[in-house]
Amino acid sequence: MQKANIDGKVWRFGKDIDTDLIIAARYLSTSVPEELAKHVMEDADPQFVKKMSSGDIIVAGENFGCGSSREHAPIALKAAGVAAVIAPTFARIFYRNAFNMGLPIFELQESAEIAEGDEISVDMNNGTITNKTSSKVYKFIPIPQFMQELIDAGGLMNFAQNEIKGK
């Protein structure tokens, strides 16, 4: 494992944030990550890209990433600099797409206790999230080793290329 901790400021979103809210269908004519990043979450919060900083963390309600299957959603989040997404549950196809694109996501039932603006630290090795603002510590089930390897490689394509090269 490369990076054991993710530290960032929290941006809150509600439940059932679908892939069309993450990146609207009107932007799907491009697959250029930098272009997608300019419009991430704009239908949920038009100022999100202007307010957030690279390394910030989205904390949302249940069923994050529901709706249509589009790899553009995790690509846009990652390209915008979102370091991780935390929610009680994720739509299964988004869950898989996020790891395939190298975006760390974590399931935390108590995510509603984390407020917008809080500073948190995710310890991927030990399965803890520390809210530096409230001093609360939460436990989550660490992601499986193979999925951590996908994150470390930057996604499935990079992982496969590294395997082919024998790294």
UniProtKB/Swiss-Prot annotation:
GO BP terms: L-leucine biosynthetic process
Top-level class of the enzyme under EC nomenclature: lyase
TM helices/strands, residue ranges: none
EC number(s) recorded for this UniProt protein: 4.2.1.33
Pathway membership, UniProt: Amino-acid biosynthesis; L-leucine biosynthesis; L-leucine from 3-methyl-2-oxobutanoate: step 2/4
The keyword Calcium belongs to this UniProt entry's keyword annotation: no
The keyword Disulfide bond belongs to this UniProt entry's keyword annotation: no
PANTHER family: 3-ISOPROPYLMALATE DEHYDRATASE SMALL SUBUNIT 1, 3-ISOPROPYLMALATE DEHYDRATASE SMALL SUBUNIT 2-RELATED-RELATED
Annotated NCBIfam families: LEUD_arch (TIGR02087)
Quaternary structure and interacting proteins, as annotated: Heterodimer of LeuC and LeuD.
Family: Belongs to the LeuD family. LeuD type 2 subfamily.
Function text: Catalyzes the isomerization between 2-isopropylmalate and 3-isopropylmalate, via the formation of 2-isopropylmaleate.
HAMAP family xrefs: LeuD_type2
Protein name (Swiss-Prot/TrEMBL): 3-isopropylmalate dehydratase small subunit
Native species: Sulfurimonas denitrificans (strain ATCC 33889 / DSM 1251)
Organism ancestry: Bacteria, Pseudomonadati, Campylobacterota, Epsilonproteobacteria, Campylobacterales
